[in-house]
């Protein structure tokens, strides 16, 4: 599907979210460029300096800045433009039309996370006239978060990120703040053997039996021994899950290849390079391993600014949960690294986490409107306006 036709009405958080839903940015293939440039034009018209950065053709991220003339660095808001595929189940609503039913706005990306982008961009447009001589505001709109945070990794790796004193990641949290998430590491392990007729297995070399030995070793992985820690005071324990297992083509042959994929969720203090080396040592000569996707853990100890974000959320939602971390991973970890590390980061957005990636995904219109006010307060307080 392409872009849906939209009725030209005065810009509002709802209309801006609908406009973004109309761009088909399913990843793969992503093709975020048209959506990125649409947002870039809106921000340029409001006085932002806008730069486009593509890690591949049509895979475009945006960095937009305003202010930033003072010693205090800008505050950064970030969100990803890409969305996940629709899935096999039939939708009852057009996933790109932005249909509403009462308080619900339907569409792929409505919760994850075009509503969050629309909310902080609308807040930025409202405040732009007051930000030109302030510490400033930076908006980072990324491509391909859903497949390994490729856009954020590119921006960080190419040193395209200047300064930020704080980061807000507008992923779906139902307008409740979180202070981090576990890291993500996916690997594929492969073993090789020699095929033979199943009636003469001694003439072959069974790759599946080799893999069984590896799986047994991984299943008994000692995080404390190999990585120096097996628990975080907020996130809890790291996890390792053997996710897929493929071997053999037919029952009457000795399998000459076997593959497994492993999902690991890591906590601060676990170095992914060291973790991979430990796994390779366990695998030894039995097989080989390659990394598929990696995102480092993200965690910020509560400080004065983070407490002020919790204050803002409480003022608009009436809730103040204890500082905790979210289950999914985000661009925040790579962007924090790109800004030099240690930048206090909060995950906060209007979407509902349980609806992300679901058939008939929707977001509360009321929560989008509340998040605009909440984001405006956070931006105002940072910039003293």
Model-predicted regions and their roles:
Residues 57-60, 174, 328-331:
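Short acidic loop-to-helix transition motifs that present clustered carboxylates
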Residues 86-101, 163-164, 179-190, 346:
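Acidic-glycine-rich active-site phosphate/pyrophosphate-binding loop
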Residues 6-108, 129-133, 352:
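Acidic/His- and Gly-rich active-site-bordering loop/insert found
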Residues 105, 110-111, 115-220, 360-371, ...:
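Fold-level recognition of mixed alpha/beta catalytic cores in primary-metabolism enzymes, strongest
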Residues 51, 179, 186-385:
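Metal-dependent amide/peptide-bond hydrolase catalytic core
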Residues 1-3, 43, 334-339:
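Hydrophobic residues within well-ordered alpha-helices
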Residues 73-75, 103-104, 138, 165-168, ...:
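Structural motif
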């Amino acid at each position: 599907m392409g872009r849906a036709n939209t009725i030209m009405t005065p810009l509002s958080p709802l209309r801006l979210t609908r406009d973004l839903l109309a761009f088909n940015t399913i990843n793969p293939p992503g093709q975020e460029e048209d959506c990125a440039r649409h947002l870039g034009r809106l921000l340029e018209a409001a006085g932002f300096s806008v730069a486009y950065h593509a890690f591949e053709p049509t895979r475009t991220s945006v960095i937009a800045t305003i202010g930033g003339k003072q010693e205090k660095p800008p505050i950064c808001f970030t969100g990803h433009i890409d969305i996940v595929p629709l899935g096999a189940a039939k939708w009852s609503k057009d996933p790109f039309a932005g249909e509403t039913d009462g308080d619900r706005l339907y569409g792929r990306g409505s919760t994850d996370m075009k509503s969050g982008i629309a909310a902080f961009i609308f807040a930025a447009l409202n405040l732009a006239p007051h930000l030109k001589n302030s510490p400033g505001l930076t908006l980072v709109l990324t491509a391909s978060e859903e497949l390994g945070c490729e856009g954020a990794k590119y921006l960080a790796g190419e040193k395209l990120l200047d300064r930020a004193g704080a980061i807000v990641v507008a992923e779906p949290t139902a307008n409740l703040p979180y202070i981090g998430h576990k890291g993500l590491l996916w690997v594929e392990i492969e073993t090789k053997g020699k095929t033979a007729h199943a009636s003469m297995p001694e003439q072959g070399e069974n790759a599946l039996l080799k893999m069984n030995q590896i799986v047994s070793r991984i299943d008994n992985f000692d995080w404390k021994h190999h990585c120096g820690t097996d628990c975080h005071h907020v996130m809890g324990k790291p996890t390792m899950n053997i996710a897929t297992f493929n071997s053999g083509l037919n029952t009457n042959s000795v399998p000459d290849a076997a593959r497994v994929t492993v999902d690991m969720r890591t906590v601060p203090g676990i170095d992914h390079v060291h973790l991979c080396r430990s796994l390779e040592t366990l695998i030894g000569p039995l097989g080989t391993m390659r990394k598929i996707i990696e995102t480092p853990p993200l965690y910020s100890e509560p400080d004065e600014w983070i407490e002020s974000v919790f204050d803002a959320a409480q003022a608009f939602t009436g809730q103040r949960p204890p500082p905790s971390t979210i289950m999914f991973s985000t661009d925040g970890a790579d962007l924090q690294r790109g800004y030099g590390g240690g930048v206090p980061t909060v995950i906060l957005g209007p979407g509902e986490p349980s609806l992300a990636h679901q058939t008939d995904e929707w977001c509360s219109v009321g929560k989008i409107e509340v998040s605009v006010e909440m984001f405006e307060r956070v931006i105002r307080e940072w910039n003293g306006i």
